[in-house]
Design a protein with these regions (language model features):
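Hydrophobic cores of alpha-helical transmembrane segments in multi-pass inner/ER membrane proteins
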Residues: 2-4, 71-88, 146-157, 216-232
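Alpha-helical transmembrane segments of multi-pass membrane proteins
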Residues: 30-53
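Interfacial helix-loop-helix junctions of multi-pass membrane proteins
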Residues: 49, 124-133, 191-214
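Perimembrane loop-to-helix junctions flanking transmembrane segments
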Residues: 51-68, 131-134
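Membrane-interface helix-boundary motifs at transmembrane edges
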Residues: 91-102, 161-173
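Alpha-helical transmembrane segments of multi-pass integral membrane proteins
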Residues: 103-111, 168-193
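Membrane-proximal helix-loop-helix units in multi-pass membrane proteins
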Residues: 115-157
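Short, highly charged, low-complexity non-transmembrane loops/tails of multi-pass membrane proteins
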Residues: 237-256
Length: 256
């Protein structure tokens, strides 16, 4: 919500942007539902409907398994948003001389890396070399899940103490968000890998459904995580906010 602050007429007016955790969550949930329906819709049209203009173009723009399209940009931006909020919390904690500052900042860096990985599909570059090295198949057909699972386990070990110090509700939300995200990233990826190992061509509606569920779980996990961060700020960092002042350059202020 945007509203004007109650200040005197002769003073500059300030617009306050008020964001509640629930409003943010509702927005992201709506976006996820729209993206999931659009992804399945264009794939259904691709495989079952007669030819129509922009048939393959729409699939490229909206199917969640394609690169550099609308769902990818949504995921990248929400991961960057997580990184920004985590960095904001870390800096606020530093100003208040709070605890676990390095953990908050490390999480910020991790989410920035996840955003870069989402944009550039770095993890997929691990599939072929690991697959050739270990001759993986079945649930490990997409072999990057092996280092992915190891990375997840190491992060869980490192952040166990940090999770323990969080308020109970925040900790539960963090764990829920992580479970959804990992369930999509690794769990559904393994199911998709198993299915892919049984067929010769992944261009079918069944694989499209698997991938859409996978990406939707990832998006849902990120949405819940953003909600948990905003909830943490609003309940346990009361008085913390972000204000943006728009000022003239020094040169213009001197000449005024």
């Amino acid at each position: 919500m945007i509203k004007r602050s109650p200040v005197r007429e002769d003073l500059p007016q300030t617009l306050l942007f008020e964001l509640t955790p629930q409003h943010a969550l509702n927005f992201f949930l709506g976006a996820i539902v729209i993206l999931a329906i659009a992804s399945l819709g264009v794939q259904f049209g691709l495989y079952y409907l007669p030819e129509y203009p922009s048939k393959t173009i729409l699939s490229g723009l909206l199917f969640v398994d394609c690169e550099s399209n609308i769902p990818t940009m949504y995921s990248v931006l929400t991961l960057i948003l997580c990184s920004v909020i985590l960095g904001f919390i870390a800096n606020a904690k530093r100003a208040m001389r709070g605890a676990y500052i390095n953990y908050w900042m490390t999480l910020s860096v991790i989410f920035l890396f996840l955003a870069i990985d989402e944009f550039a599909s770095l993890h997929e570059k691990l599939i072929e070399p690991i697959h050739l090295k270990l001759n993986t198949s079945g649930f490990l057909y997409f072999a990057w899940v092996i280092p992915g699972a190891a990375f997840t386990f190491v992060c869980l070990l490192i952040f166990t103490r940090f999770l323990g110090h969080l308020p109970t509700q925040t900790r539960r939300l963090f764990l829920l968000a992580g479970s959804l995200y990992v369930g999509g990233t690794l769990g559904m990826e393994m199911i998709g890998g198993y299915y892919s190992s049984l067929i010769t061509d992944r261009n079918n509606i069944i694989y499209s459904v698997i991938v859409t569920i996978e990406e939707s779980l990832e998006m849902l996990g990120v949405a819940v995580f953003i909600y948990s961060l905003l909830h943490y700020i609003s309940y346990y960092m009361k008085g913390t906010g972000l204000r943006i002042n728009i000022v003239a350059s020094k040169k213009k202020r001197r000449s005024a």
